[in-house]
């Protein structure tokens, strides 16, 4: 078994290379052992539309049943429907088989104990159980239950649009296609849907809305029909991408500004959490609207647990994970987030660009990934942090964000790749270039 499949936020690898039926059965046994030690036995299993997911369901369930778990199989569904089932069916945990937004040859597993997603050391504990080879034994069971209709009804009862909205959605042949078009039409929207048929080969484009290339068809259709908004979902519908009528991509931190204003209107002083990669505009706007913005570590599991700790009503990431604890359960759900966006649009005659038109103009880079071996990346970031700490104010909850009066630069170690991640923002293109050069030159000096 390749230990590298146990990642920071989930378990994932290449089908038949890292993930075999035997490895998946062991995962099922390890999960059963881990959760039984906590006195929990009633769990859920769901899966995405990847070609290998039905196959992996068999050994996963066998392993879990051999450990005495009572399983409800909810079939093919988006990841947020799996999270919803933990509340709706009142289960004590579960496993979602999903490769999320990774290429077709990948698959993976998101693991929940109680209502929480495992991350970090807890995921490594599953690996340690497999390596020790001592598994819980018992006589489990499997039953089947359809949860998608209950999920759709829940959202329809909790979302209210003031007028009909014309929009385009692109499910990227992922699982959102089985759920989102119906909800949006039942809300009264005029929906043009692209690639709603689930197909694990992803024949039209890769299901990752953070990459502009994958949004081209959505942008073209929004412009062609004159839609108010375009919404793209990733492969398992826990991340959202948004396009405005002129065809600009609204990144996660801008989207969070719209959601934050709405939440703060109803809950003055609320706490809102985002990550170190986000624009200064977001934190300034939260403060301007009377909220408490917390800059936290990147990574959806880390953000979710920080939200619980701070009793935050809203959280979000650049990557499009949006977490609503306001009127919802606090997990990342791109379908629910799109409904909340439509609520905002339905209550105004302003367009998306007009709603964001009062933000100060800034210039930023996308995330820049610089290859750096896993065994060196944390030490390098630490040295960069110590070097800048002497001269500039910094934020160091995750790597180092160096603060300037008119911009910032971020250097952090990637949680998922052998790389360091850089991002820069400034008030002018010239200043952006200067900040970037200053920080990149410092990294070069330190890594000599």
What are these regions (language model features)?
Residues 1-62, 66-68, 144-166:
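An N-terminal, well-structured beta->alpha segment
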Residues 37, 42-106, 182-243:
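N-terminal small/polar loop signature for handling phosphorylated ligands or for N-terminal nucleophile
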Residues 71-80, 249-252, 274-275, 296:
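Active-site nucleophile and cofactor-binding loops and adjacent substrate-binding regions
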Residues 92-100, 104-106, 222-244, 249, ...:
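Glycine-rich phosphate-binding loop
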Residues 105-225:
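Gly/Ser/Thr-enriched, mixed-charge loops and adjacent short helices
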Residues 265-423, 428-448:
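Phosphate-binding and adjacent anionic-ligand microenvironments
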